[in-house]
Amino acid sequence: MKKHLNAVLATITACLILLNISCNKAKSAEANTIAAAVKKDSVTVAKPEPGSIIDTADYNRRMIALSNNDTTGRWPVKTPYPLPGAILPYHRIIAFYGNLYSKRMGILGEIPKAEMLKKLDGEVKKWQAADTSTIAIPALHYIATTAQGAPGKDGKHRMRLAHRQIDTVISWARPIKALVFLDIQVGHSTVKEEVPTLEKYLMMPDVHLGIDPEFSLKNGHVPGTKIGTMDATDINDAINYLQKIVRDNKLPPKVLVVHRFTQGMVTNYKNIKICPEVQVVMDMDGFGDKILKKSTYLTYIKREPVQFTGFKLFYKNDIRKDPNGMYTPEELLKLIPKPIYIQFQ
């Protein structure tokens, strides 16, 4: 009986061993199957479309490069990451500024179209050669609403120019893949009142906005007799409007250029809203010799950081006293931080 029991136990043990081996093989086979499936899925899973995500490491690297070894701790500014499709800091914008109704307001409108576009292309190439790490792209920065000495019928001291000229500028820009900026001088009006008049254009992905505090005369002075001012609340009115347009129309981020060359032109800069939908450029807008322009940039742009910086060059006023008075790309790239938006007037 004992021998018989031992034989049964031996048989059961052998069966259990075989069963364990079989189970392990099954688990191993299952694991291999899962691994193969995972490997297969990792190959066949749909990748995001180009531009549907942002490479934050690349963005950070570019922002650090723009800060140009700043030691003050102000740059780069800590802001939310932009939405995919952002222009900055991946590109440097080279813009020609002006108005088609006047030859005195800038290079855009001062000389014939073909000559102007050729000159713009030359400036873009100079910047591309000076900084090969950042793609230089052209832009036409058109003054769509101009401040006026006369009050006009509504007493707002501003003139909204005909949209057909905006259409013309856009028709010039698109064949050369240039951006378009529409600039607003509010006079005695407000940003909140004026920006919506350009909505149909701002809904276009290649059209952006500029606002000029110099011609915002809240105190009642006639534009051109005093330098105006905008508070962060005024600038935020533009940002909020652009943010909504981007969200509602699923657009890439808009660029907002804010001109500045005095302390009083922008107040409460720390309260300027930065959001993923809008990229803010504070543009050094003053003319004069190199020492004056650099001082203006360092005092009002570098010292009061918002997000990105710009620098305006004047073909005539900058060289009035010195034929070599206009900054070169190489010289401007030594500034801290480096400007990412360059405007010619």
Where do the protein language model's features map onto the residues?
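C-terminal motif of bacterial Sec signal peptides marking the signal peptidase cleavage site
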Residues: 19-22
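Acidic, His- and aromatic-enriched active-site or binding-groove loops in soluble protein domains
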Residues: 163, 202-213, 232-235, 277-292
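Bacterial N-terminal signal peptides that target proteins for export
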Residues: 2-10
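Substrate-binding cleft of extracellular glycoside hydrolase catalytic domains
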Residues: 126-128, 135-214
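Active-site beta-loop-alpha junctions enriched in small/polar residues
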Residues: 99-101, 143-147, 185-187, 214-216, ...
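Substrate-binding surface in catalytic domains of secreted glycosidases
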Residues: 213-251
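Alpha/beta catalytic barrel-like cores
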Residues: 24-159, 274-278, 292-345
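Aromatic-lined carbohydrate-recognition surfaces of secreted/lumenal glycan-active proteins
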Residues: 186-191, 247-265
